[in-house]
Amino acid sequence: YVLDAQRHFVPDSFDFVLQTVGIYTNVEIMNKACVILQDKLASFMQSLDSDIIPILHSETTIENCYDIVLENEDYTLGKVLEYLLYEKYYANEKIFTFCGFKKFHPHNDDSTIRIAYENPTDKHMLAQHLRTVAGEARDIFGKIRTFFQL
């Protein structure tokens, strides 16, 4: 607390510097990045609807725990989903007891989101929660993209 007394900051505000080597302008890079992320999220939602995304019971001591395996995905998609799941279902609605993301090794193509529920829950409810936050993330990147329209 003592060290935070003199600290002035805006919560959840991040400043980035984007530099280019000249092939694309900064605005084009941001626009393309938002489009790619929106497409990834749409593909993720389709995979959820088709039951392609592996949702496994976690082999941990945490009760009501599931692992969502993100195949061929890393921090870009995983941390977005983890953050939104955490904010919505852990911090606000308090139906999660745990929410975390891990990529076990840089050479692995897969990463894992681990979620634990307060009460016993089936995989369909988990898939619905994932679908909800993926839709929210897609909307967020759509809003960000409007700032970088050409």
What positions do the PLM features span?
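Protein-protein interaction/assembly regions in multi-subunit complexes
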Residues: Y1-L150
